[in-house]
Design a protein with these regions (language model features):
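Conserved small/polar residues in nucleotide/adenosyl-binding loops
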Residues: 101-103
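General secondary-structure propensity
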Residues: 1-2, 65, 88
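Vicinal oxygen chelate
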Residues: 13-21, 50-55, 72-98
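A detector for short, charged/polar N-terminal pre-domain segments
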Residues: 1-12, 73-75
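Core segments of cupin and vicinal oxygen chelate
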Residues: 8-10, 17-61, 66-67
Length: 103
């Protein structure tokens, strides 16, 4: 019998899930600035992102558009966030330059 690993392939022990306003725009930003690869995206009939997954280096993040009817609100909607993400990249100067271009 094969052993089932408790962490799915491509994931780490902790995987952040971001709720944002304008998830499609955020995905493009993460691709352009951090070199993220889009693993998958599920869009609703209105085009809003219901769920998406990105790979940045060896880490996966999940994100979706805010959906207040389900209790999911973005930091913008609640006036800030108690959460920070630390992203380790080999060339910080390049990332800063890209972030200024794609802001």
């Amino acid at each position: 019998m094969s052993k089932i690993h408790h962490i799915p392939k491509g994931y780490n022990s902790v995987t952040p899930y971001l709720v944002v306003k304008g998830a499609a725009k955020a995905i493009e930003y993460y691709k352009n600035v951090f070199g993220a690869t889009e693993v998958m995206r599920m869009a609703g009939p209105d085009g809003r992102v219901g769920h998406a997954e990105l790979q940045i280096g060896d880490s996966r993040i999940m994100l979706a558009d805010e959906n207040p009817s389900m209790g999911n609100r973005s930091a913008e909607s609640i006036g800030g966030s108690p959460v920070s993400l630390y992203v380790y990249l080999p060339d910080c100067d390049k990332v800063v330059a890209l972030s200024l271009i794609h802001i």
